[in-house]
Structure formats: C-alpha cells, structure tokens
From Swiss-Prot:
Recorded name of the encoding gene: CYP6B6
Enzyme class: oxidoreductase
Descriptive protein name: Cytochrome P450 6B6
Record: residues binding heme: 445
Domain of life: Eukaryota
C-alpha cells in the first residue's frame, strides 16, 4: 500500500524544501530595499557557489544592477545580506560607526589557526590588534628591507638564468617564488641558502589552501554552523605544518628574539611582555595570553597576506606594463634615474620616493583589488543615516571594491590602465572611499606596508634589468579564476621577459 503514498510523500518533501529554502526571500521587500530576485538553494550567489564565477566578480555584477541605489538587498543562500554602494554609507560603516561593524562575521572554530588577527572578532580581535598592530608599522618593514633585498637579488639572478633558455614566462607562478622565499625569510627566519625544502613545503601548503573549500561553502549556506560544530575552514594539514614550523623556530631561538628583526623575533618580543589586553570598548578589559597557538595563527595569516596577494598584484602590474609600452618606458626612465643618483643601489627610501612607480602600483590595485568582497557584521541594530533602512544585529554587510573601482562615476574609462589617476590633485578630488584595495579604517589590511614594499622592490629590480613584452600566448582578455577565494588570473599570465641589453 505504501507505494500509493510514495508520490505524495515526495511531493510534500519537495514543497517543504522549497518553502524552507525560500522562507526568508521577502526580508528585503518588507523593508523596501531593492535587490535582484534570489533563486532556490543559492539566493543570489549561484554562480559563486557552483562555482562558475569568482565571488568578487559576482559582487561586482550585483553592484552594477542597481546604479541608483545606496544599498542592495541580497541573499547569501537563505541569509539576508546588504551590499552597500553609497560611499558615504561605506564611510559610516568602515570609519565613523566602526564600533557597530568591528566584526568581520566569518564564523568558524577559533581554535588553532582561527585565532588570527584577520578572522578574529570581538574582544579577541581588539586584544590581538592592540598587541600585534605595532609589528606592521612603517619602521618594522624597513628593518626587514635587507632580507627583502637579498631575496630580490636572488630572484633576478634566477630570472636571468632562465632567460637564457626561454624568454616567455608565466609570471604569476614566477613571482610566487619570490614572495614565498621572501616571506620565508622575513617571517620565519629561513635563510636563502637553506630555503629550498622549506619553500617546497610552503608550496604544498599553498596548494592545499587553494583547493575549493567545502567548509567555506557550508558556512555560506548555513552561517554560524561551523562555529557551532567547532569546525575550522583551515585543513588540519595546514595547521600541523605551521605548528611544526613555529615550534621549531621558537625552540631554535630558545623562546627569545634572535636579533634578525624578522616577524618571529617581533612576536617573541611581544610574548615577553605577557598577556595581550584590550579595554578600548566597554568598561571591562579582556586579556589573551600569547601562547604558541596564538603565535602560529599570526604566522599563518602573515604568510597568507604577504605571499599570494603580493605575487598576484605584481603579476597584474607586469601584465599591464607589457600592454602599455609608453607607461613602461616612463617607469624604466624613473628607475634608471634613481639608480644613477644612488650609485646603482635600491634602498628603502628610493623605493618610496619613486612617484610614478607608486602611482602605477596604486592603479594596478584599483583594477585588480585582490581581496573581494569586504565583509562586516552588525553587532547591534543600526539605522543607516539618511535612510529608513535598519540593519538588524548579526546582518552581514558587503562592500565591492571591484564594483567601486570600475564605476565610471569615480573613474573615467575605468578599464584603461592610467597611473595618472593617482596624481595628488586627482586623488584629492575623489571621495576617500572610492579606493578600497586594502579596506579602510581600523580593520584595514595591516600588512599593506610590507606587501607594498616587497612588491615595489621586486618590480624596480625587474625593470632595471628587463623589459616586459607581450608574447604570442599573452591573453588580451584575462578572466578571473573562479575557484580561489582571492582575485587571480585564470590560466596565469604569459609574457616575454627580455634582458634590456638585447632590446633594440
């Protein structure tokens, strides 16, 4: 008899699932917030979830759908989220009313690598920030410059040797060898002479991290579930690798600074100071002991921030220089002039003083903002100034730097590579929130000084020896890799790297 009821049971199940996965889809309509129609199971992130498109590209497309709206109501699977377009509203969220949006809202187990400065929220983040932010102030990367310089020289020697065999390179993976070795030296004190095996190990870690993460997809579908189940988004193999690496370094240095002035030295100096405390907000202070686990988590995020983002940004800059010979000529002239004035040496100060180089780097970051989208979580109900829209507590707020950076309201001909956009006069005309490659406010990218320095040093060294030219395999219409969390080139970037003495 049951067979006669089977179709009815299936029908009820399908209808129940439909209503379950669409139960929130009137949330924004009830609040008179416009947005695209969501689809069952996926909300507005179908292309990202499958994955057919990178999350940053999806957010840019959503941004462009409603050009007259200040905010757009969207759904991350079934969860209502708010995509903010208006720059003044962004300024309130990131700066003026930061205490309401101080959390990123990335919820998973904070054990192990989860207690890092990027992902931590609440009092844990404040405690970490109070103690660890000084590590990334301008003076600290300057002290590491000698390590970066040694790495850049080794990298140029490697490229020169490879050029004798073949002048065409896939520059994204090529530049990863530079940033990985530099991070290994600046973060973990691994000398360039003994770097081979460690870099191979870090390369394996990168491949594990870059694989599609089902944990992240699960968090998108059911926000907060990973935290409730005490699950991490980081594979156990990655956690074990960094724990072993940090344990060995701490043991080699007897738990004390070694005098190298690298990242581990700075953290060991902080550990000698005792607990990390936070009392910026509220009347009660919280504390966090700097354990080996906390050190491991910060070492991990330093590696992630300095390795992939810098390599990708440099690869995109190299790509644009290959397609823009006039701009490349100006940069080479500036590099030659600086080297001539400094006896052929590249110093910390000369890197910062090269105005056109810095403008070209800023323009690269405008066109290719690597971390997309920016995310915050409301810690209480918040009424958006100048509107009737109330962001309820725990709502995720998203910002699309890519959408803003390609908005013709803020940048003429936004698809054109034009470093002159960053003349001081032009920058002064723009809203401060029209440029967000590093985020903004207290939760901006604290590693931006380090990343910028190692990138500009490397590009300077490259242009002092080589010209960049399109190869027969250079893709004139680069696509974004859909499977990685960061913005990156699908299929890599192929160009010719030609020794300048061979250029007619």
């Amino acid at each position: 008899m049951w067979i006669f009821y089977f179709p009815a049971v299936i029908s009820v199940l399908i209808v129940s699932l439909y209503f379950y996965f669409t139960r929130t889809f009137n949330y924004w309509k009830k609040r008179n917030v416009r947005g695209p129609e969501p689809t069952v199971f996926f909300g507005n992130l179908k292309d990202s979830a499958l994955p057919r498109k990178n999350m940053g590209v999806v957010m840019e497309e959503l941004y462009n759908m409603f050009p007259e709206e200040k905010v757009i109501g969207i759904y991350r699977m079934t969860s209502p989220c708010l995509l903010v377009r208006d720059l003044e509203v962004i300024k309130h969220i990131m700066i003026k009313d930061f205490e309401v949006f101080s959390d990123r809202g990335v919820e998973f187990s904070k054990e192990g690598l989860g207690s890092n400065l990027f992902h931590a929220d609440g009092e844990t983040w404040r405690a970490l920030r109070n103690r660890f932010t000084p590590i990334f102030t301008s003076g600290k990367p300057k002290n590491m410059f000698y390590l970066m310089h040694e790495g850049a020289d080794n990298f140029i020697d490697h490229v020169s040797a490879e050029c004798e065999k073949n002048q065409e390179f896939e520059v994204h993976s090529l530049l990863q060898t530079y940033t990985m070795s530099t991070i290994a030296a600046c973060a973990f004190g691994i000398s360039y002479d003994s770097i081979g095996d460690k870099v191979k190990a870090l390369d394996i870690v990168d491949k594990i991290i870059s694989e599609p993460s089902y944990a992240i997809e699960l968090d998108m579908m059911y926000p907060g579930l990973l935290s409730k189940l005490n699950l991490s988004i980081f594979p156990t193999a990655v956690k074990n690798f960094f724990k072993s690496l940090v344990d060995n370094i701490v043991a080699q240095r007897n738990g004390k600074p070694s005098g190298r002035n690298d990242f581990m030295d700075l953290i060991l100096e902080l550990r000698q100071l005792g607990e990390v405390t936070s009392n910026k907000y509220g009347s009660s202070a919280s504390s966090l002991e700097i354990t080996d686990e906390v050190i491991c988590a910060q070492a991990f995020v330093f590696y992630i921030a300095g390795y992939e983002t810098s390599a990708t940004t440099m690869a995109y800059m190299i790509y644009q220089l290959a397609l823009s010979p006039d701009i490349q000529n100006k940069l080479i002239a500036e590099v030659d002039e600086v080297l001539k004035a400094n006896d052929g040496k590249v110093t910390y100060d000369t890197v910062k003083e090269m105005k056109y180089m810095n403008k070209a780097f800023d323009e690269t970051l405008r066109m290719y903002s690597i971390v997309e989208p920016l995310q915050r979580k409301a810690t209480r109900d918040y009424k958006i100034p100048g509107t009737d829209v109330v962001i309820e507590k725990d709502t995720i707020v998203l910002i699309s730097p890519r959408g803003i950076h390609y908005d013709p309201k803020y940048y003429d001909n936004p698809k054109q590579f034009n470093p002159d956009r960053f003349d001081a006069e032009e920058v002064g005309k723009r809203h401060p929130c029209a440029y967000l490659p590093f985020g903004l406010g207290q939760r901006n990218c604290i590693g931006m000084r380090f990343g910028r320095l190692q990138s500009l040093l490397c590009i300077t060294k490259i242009l002092s020896k080589f010209r960049i030219e399109p190869s027969k395999n250079t893709d004139r219409n680069l696509q974004v890799e859909p499977h990685r969390g960061l913005i990156g080139p699908k299929g890599g970037i192929r160009v010719n790297v030609v020794p300048r003495k061979l250029v007619s």
